[in-house]
Amino acid sequence: MDKQTLVIKLGGALIENDEALTALFATLKTFLDEQHRPLVLVHGGGCLVDDLLKGLGLTSTKKNGLRVTPFEQIPFIAGALAGTANKMMMAKAIATDIPAVGLCLADGGLCQVTQLDPALGAVGDCQPGNPALVTGILGQGFLPVVSSIGITAQGQLMNVNADQAATAIAEALGADLVMLSDVSGILDGKGKLVPQLDKVTALDLMEKGVISDGMAVKVKAALHAAETLGKPVCVASWRYPDQLLKLLAGGAVGTQVAI
């Protein structure tokens, strides 16, 4: 594998939008066929978790953009993310003729996960681990599809924010990182796209409340990744396949987050 590995984090309501998911995987197929570049997908699936918990009569809250995960709920959340969401992604890959392997953060020790904050319950902090398994899978021509469920050294299932998980995986692989969500990138106070975002500007926008909640988590993860990887991280949308192909080919799309 001579070409730089690319980690793509898929988020937002994508998993509930079958048409968009189909278009995305068609774009990824074109990219893989044309570029022959190693690719890793990392996904969450918060909308599936919300639907499942609601169906079970359970409540779900967030604190600073992170889902509070009571330990009694983690079996359901792990089932939604590592089970349903992961296999839905796998199904699209297979239907698009992309050979893929479904994984979680614990497989092969890819990421080291510990409890982030007791107040959040079974929510994990994610650090880069051993990339050997994923590197081997990539070397065999498969697409790793990784859910954001981790396991601690004590064997406890943990729900990890998918942006943070993708960052840790990119660090472990020394890869480029693209974060795809519902929005076209980072937006300013007037709803306009910010093409380039540095740490000083990002902190200022967060202090003013322009960037908050889930987007703040995303920006912090992107800043951390940009600093660790020593290169910009892109935050863009999955909604426009033509723009996505341009982005994957190195074009300027979305927001470039740099230190």
UniProtKB/Swiss-Prot annotation:
Would you tell me the protein name for this molecule? Acetylglutamate kinase
E.C. designation(s) = 2.7.2.8
**What family does the Swiss-Prot or TrEMBL record give for this protein?**
Belongs to the acetylglutamate kinase family. ArgB subfamily.
Its EC top class is transferase
Q: Where does substrate bind?
A: 45-46, 67, 159
Q: What does this protein do?
A: Catalyzes the ATP-dependent phosphorylation of N-acetyl-L-glutamate.
Q: What NCBIfam families is this protein classified in?
A: argB
